[in-house]
UniProtKB/Swiss-Prot annotation:
<feature type="binding site">
    <location>
        <position position="101"/>
    </location>
    <ligand>
        <name>substrate</name>
    </ligand>
</feature>
<feature type="active site" description="Proton donor">
    <location>
        <position position="245"/>
    </location>
</feature>
<comment type="pathway">
    <text>Amino-acid biosynthesis; L-methionine biosynthesis via salvage pathway; L-methionine from S-methyl-5-thio-alpha-D-ribose 1-phosphate: step 1/6.</text>
</comment>
<feature type="site" description="Transition state stabilizer">
    <location>
        <position position="165"/>
    </location>
</feature>
<dbReference type="InterPro" id="IPR000649">
    <property type="entry name" value="IF-2B-related"/>
</dbReference>
<keyword id="KW-0486">Methionine biosynthesis</keyword>
<dbReference type="InterPro" id="IPR037171">
    <property type="entry name" value="NagB/RpiA_transferase-like"/>
</dbReference>
<dbReference type="InterPro" id="IPR027363">
    <property type="entry name" value="M1Pi_N"/>
</dbReference>
<dbReference type="GO" id="GO:0019509">
    <property type="term" value="P:L-methionine salvage from methylthioadenosine"/>
</dbReference>
<protein>
    <recommendedName>
        <fullName>Methylthioribose-1-phosphate isomerase</fullName>
        <ecNumber>5.3.1.23</ecNumber>
    </recommendedName>
</protein>
<dbReference type="Pfam" id="PF01008">
    <property type="entry name" value="IF-2B"/>
</dbReference>
<comment type="similarity">
    <text>Belongs to the eIF-2B alpha/beta/delta subunits family. MtnA subfamily.</text>
</comment>
<dbReference type="InterPro" id="IPR042529">
    <property type="entry name" value="IF_2B-like_C"/>
</dbReference>
<comment type="function">
    <text>Catalyzes the interconversion of methylthioribose-1-phosphate (MTR-1-P) into methylthioribulose-1-phosphate (MTRu-1-P).</text>
</comment>
<feature type="binding site">
    <location>
        <begin position="255"/>
        <end position="256"/>
    </location>
    <ligand>
        <name>substrate</name>
    </ligand>
</feature>
<keyword id="KW-0413">Isomerase</keyword>
<feature type="binding site">
    <location>
        <begin position="58"/>
        <end position="60"/>
    </location>
    <ligand>
        <name>substrate</name>
    </ligand>
</feature>
């Protein structure tokens, strides 16, 4: 069921994390939200790569879009008579952008698109790059709105939902993936209650998700990550809805650390588990989750909150950013191409090919 026509996008889709000005890429600095609304101006591809690595911009679709504009900025620093010549000169910048966040497949996918159009371009290769970067952003927004309606159609009226990390407008070109489903579900009066996990250590749920929902006038309840199983046992939620940074050929899904344990708890308590992501997040070349490189960040991120240290000196920490949820724990993967129920290799191949 697709009820996108009944969604008031003026209310539910007005936050934009990226703005191309024609001269630079303006990024809403997500490290400073919700108390400071400030933009980072990126005038070079290296500035974009740093913004991606430092989490000024985050969310798999958003960093792919940012990388596309990063290539446009890199193009201003070289001279070339054709796209193929430019591609050789731009390769170092492309590699630096790709290395900024290794787990999210959207980053490599966006850069591959830029490479492909550049290789075939003539003397107008700079214009070709700019058009492709804009197309990546436009297609993402359209996909998110479509996925929102598809995912909402799976939810029975009166349901409660739990989400993790931030998968909204801040993580995409707009509207969001998992949060787009929640927005659509609220607009269609299918969802009665929204819960959001805080998502340590960067607190994307606490700092970003509940702030986004507040901007839309959606009442959301924040919980500690450790309260999720108890919440499910209470019967207050019928769905856990998350995004994805990489979806493998068998349905295994890499997402923000903590997603795996939510899927385990959801299966135990009879709560359904939905993954929402554009098809650009699907990586049919990766057989299963064991093949995914899991990004490790500075252990120091676990030592405090808001710049205040809460851990004694001399303590060691382990800080993986993502985990992998096995496909057999996922009830539905929603992309703009449709819904894959109980994903496995055969169903994924039927939807996305080999």
């Amino acid at each position: 069921m697709n009820d996108s026509a009944h969604i008031d996008y003026a209310r539910y889709d007005h936050i934009r994390p990226l703005l191309w000005t024609g001269d630079a890429l303006e990024l809403l600095d997500q490290r400073k939200l919700p108390f400071v609304v400030e933009h980072v101006r990126c005038d070079s591809s290296d500035a974009v790569a740093e913004a991606i690595h430092s989490l000024a911009v985050r969310g798999a679709p958003a960093i792919g879009i940012a990388a596309g504009w990063g290539v446009v900025l890199a193009a201003r620093e070289i001279a070339a008579d054709s796209g193929s010549e430019a591609l050789q000169k731009l390769e170092p910048a492309l590699l630096r952008l790709n290395a900024a966040r290794p787990t999210a497949v959207n980053l490599a996918w966006a850069l591959m698109r830029m490479r492909r159009v550049l290789a075939a371009a003539g003397p107008d290769w700079r214009d070709v790059l700019a058009r492709e970067a804009q197309a990546i952003a436009d297609e993402d927004l359209a996909a998110n709105r479509h996925m929102g309606a598809l995912g909402a159609g799976l939810i029975a009226p009166g349901s409660g939902v739990l989400t993790h990390c931030n998968t909204g407008s801040l993580a995409t070109a707009g509207f969001g993936t998992a949060l787009g489903v929640i927005r659509a579900g609220m607009a269609q009066q299918r969802i009665s209650k929204v819960f959001a996990g805080e998502t340590r250590p960067w607190l994307q749920g606490a700092r970003l998700t509940v702030w986004e929902l507040q901007q839309d006038g959606i009442d959301a309840t924040l919980i500690a990550d450790s309260a999720a199983s108890h919440l499910m046992k209470s019967g207050l939620v019928q769905w856990v809805i998350v995004g994805a940074d990489r979806i493998c050929a068998n349905g295994d899904t890499a997402n923000k650390i903590g997603s795996y344990q939510l899927a385990i708890a959801a299966r135990h308590h009879g709560v359904k588990f939905m993954v929402v992501a554009p098809s650009s997040t699907v990586d049919m070349a990766t057989a299963d989750g064991d093949q995914i490189e899991i990004e490790q960040r500075d252990p120091g991120e676990l030592f405090g909150v808001g710049g205040v240290r809460t851990v004694a000196d001399g303590i060691h920490a382990w800080n993986p950013v993502f985990d992998v949820t096995p496909g057999h724990l996922i009830d539905a993967i929603v992309t703009e191409r449709g819904v894959i129920a109980q994903p496995d290799l055969a169903r994924m191949q039927a939807a996305f090919g080999n």
